[in-house]
């Protein structure tokens, strides 16, 4: 009897080797990641897709057992994060709370916000509130993770406690810590969104595609988080697979520009297309500014002197919007403009282009006139790349 008990505690029911246990842990934590990104994030918080009741309830049950998180709480906190991003009211912004606070205590910040009744009431609408949610998941949040612990120990013996511990820390570390923390602190940006969001890595596998956080904040209601040809979103791969089996229905993805022949006179269709693709437009303009800056820098390098050193130091930030520059950078702008009229033109036209969709009180006719005027000024600038950019704007449809 004692030997049987010791054998069970050593090996569990499955009698797996250490590497089989490790593979199991990686597999189940991956399912948890997919549950968070596909079900909680894209489906519930942003309504970017609809899930079949079978898929939806599987994820609800699985997340209850592996994280103890409730759908309504998670969706409400995340929606508030978008609504109050990078402000003091943001539940977990490293810009206001500090990177290490969010990275190391992300789960604590989540639990604290979950107790905020106003957040739940204002941002938690439209999430499941059926009998199971009221009488099982919400009522007994600890029961699910306790059941998971019993299952892990039954399958693997004492080592199952380690598997369970890994499951318990997986989301607090990767989602609450890495994504919420470093996803607003370090990485690359495809788009100049109004917040500090970044893409951590172009291949979104470990965190289910959530690595592409700047893409997500730019197109929050898109079911697909990858945007460039070299980016990969494994969450989107699973969504497509579920769609093929009738388990998911995509409602929205990021807009893709459609180009026709350039119009001599812009119309409302062109305006709407440019407005819908404004992030892509500004990202493309930013690349044009970078190319122009490199050309000017190469020219000054041939001449040599202090002007080159000044310009060289500004090459990493000159393409940004003026609102995103700090005071020392803004003070350098007049000197840069004095050294290059071409860069001055690029900078001014960038500000004017961004201002078109910032004018929320302007009528459609006024916005159209401003866009037409912008294209005319770019074409009259004498700068070939600006002329080509204006021609491309005229092609949006």
Language-model-detected regions and their locations in the chain:
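A cytosolic-side transmembrane-helix exit/cap motif
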Residues: 43-44, 181-191
